[in-house]
């Protein structure tokens, strides 16, 4: 299996990307096609004693920066690592694409270069979010700011397929993010979406979920528009960072705190592991014809390695094919209702 990796994307590229790719080659047996400034990549590998075994390098001369306007960058920076990598994926030179680069550029590129599945106009950005009981899939978390009920139904179908095929959870539960659990709550659009989700085939819809209940991890998939999802995601990240910081401050405050830390060290380590987003890989653009994974911009080697693992699982389980079948079933059901 060949996974195309953007060597120039992210705050710590190319060093962290190279390290993560090398670990993935060794642990998962994949071939990595690294796209980027080949001279810089080889020099970085040599300076950091990183093996290039199992990697094929494709040279490119441009990089899409975080400050670049996404659509314009995709059109004008034809020799950038993102555009070259996505074109390689489209041409069948690899099985999936992983990048820690610009989210906006990846979203535009996934739509215009890789193209989308039938029934999908723009892919949804989805991510596994750490929670109390178990991590849940949140979508959309930033790519589609405004969504009609029909789009939310498609998100629910794709999210359910992802959690089932990639996370291995049978019959995953799906909830709609809202300001109340009752059917009567929410905007007219959310009320309409609730009714549509109740009759959407192929999903186990359990109703609305309030933001205060989302972190409990009692459902497998939380569906919402990209604006709401981005707020949920960033608030969750902020609260987690604050709580871990407060714990550290408490343990270091005095001798009693330091003794308490020694007694609770194992539990604290487990908590940090559970809350570490890098453990879950990246955020897939669900609805693209082939797997496109967005790793966190600040990813170190572990995050890149796990994003490659995630891409491998998507390919092995034919995620895109499964989603297309489910979307076709949804379209047929909606046509029958008309």
What are these regions (language model features)?
Residues 5-15, 143-153, 294-300:
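Short, glycine-rich nucleotide/cofactor-binding loops
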Residues 13-17, 79-92, 96-110, 117, ...:
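Short glycine/serine/threonine-rich phosphate/pyrophosphate-binding segments
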Residues 111-124, 128-138, 218-222, 226-336:
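Glycine-rich phosphate/nucleotide-binding loop
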Residues 15-16, 31-33, 39, 145-207, ...:
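Glycine-rich phosphate/diphosphate-binding loop of Rossmann-like nucleotide-binding domains
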Residues 50-94:
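Phosphate/nucleotide-donor binding subsite
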Residues 25-28, 46-54, 167, 197-203:
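Short helix-capping segments at alpha-helix termini
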Residues 1-42:
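N-terminal phosphate-binding or glycine-rich loops at protein starts, especially the Walker A/P-loop
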